[in-house]
């Protein structure tokens, strides 16, 4: 079972089971049983496309918490809770895959999680190399140059 806690301290739970798997395949065309087989690219899609990941998480939480409004679910993802929900979902998906006799799918999911974390670390490292004072100086210079540039004229002002 997966769970995450929202900013108000509410614990949201869900569980990847066959009923949910069939629902997601029918509702949003995401195949958790065969996420990379027969031309299916579910695993890559949810790892690379943030909107598909949100769609997957929303529909998972909604399916497992049917008495809750859509707005409450979307609000529950605020303040970083979506990252926790994503990690909980992947963990539960791995457990489901292992118990369903699909260790290959579980291994692929774990590898995808590693790639996500590596991408985050690379982005954080790149951000740390940015010298914000240089960026601000370049922007200030560009603004100053554009303000002091002559205003182009359109047409001939002597024709009148």
Language model segments and positions:
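Charged interaction scaffolds used for protein-protein
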Residues: 1-10, 30-44, 48, 63, ...
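Short, isolated positions in well-ordered beta-strands
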Residues: 12-14
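A short, sequence-level motif marking secondary-structure junctions
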Residues: 16-21
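Short active-site loop/helix that positions an aromatic residue
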Residues: 23-26
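Elongated alpha-helical scaffolds
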Residues: 48-59
């Amino acid at each position: 079972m997966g769970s995450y806690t929202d900013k108000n301290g509410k614990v949201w739970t869900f569980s990847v089971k066959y009923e949910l798997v069939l629902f997601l395949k029918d509702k949003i065309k995401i195949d958790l049983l065969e996420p990379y087989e027969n031309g299916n690219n579910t695993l890559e899609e949810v790892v690379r496309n943030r909107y598909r990941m949100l769609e997957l998480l929303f529909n998972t939480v909604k399916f497992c918490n049917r008495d809750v409004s859509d707005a409450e679910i979307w609000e529950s993802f605020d303040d970083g809770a979506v990252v926790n929900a994503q990690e909980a979902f992947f963990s539960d998906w791995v457990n489901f895959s292992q118990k369903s006799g699909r260790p290959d799918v579980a291994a692929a999911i774990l590898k995808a999680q590693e790639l996500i974390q590596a991408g985050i670390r690379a982005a954080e490292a790149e951000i740390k190399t940015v010298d914000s004072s240089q960026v601000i100086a370049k922007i200030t210079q560009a603004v100053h140059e554009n303000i002091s540039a002559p205003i182009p004229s359109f047409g001939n002002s002597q024709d009148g």
